[in-house]
């Protein structure tokens, strides 16, 4: 069964406002999956984003581990950011 998210009227993750780090004065929030998709299970913790504009709710895009996406960067479609990677400065994955 294909576990790619196809319905876009709901969110696949939430920002954990009480679980954050700061980089150069910018808060990055840990993400938590709200649904199962691809190899991500509901309640799995992901990496860090500055806001929802950094990670699409569509497709299988995900940020794993302690990876960070911020500063106008975006992960979309089936893009993955792993381990301790940092994506920023309007990069598109």
Language-model segment annotations:
Residues 1-58:
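Terminal amphipathic alpha-helical/low-complexity segments used for targeting or macromolecular assembly
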Residues 56-93:
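A detector of tandem-repeat and repeat-rich interaction/domain scaffolds
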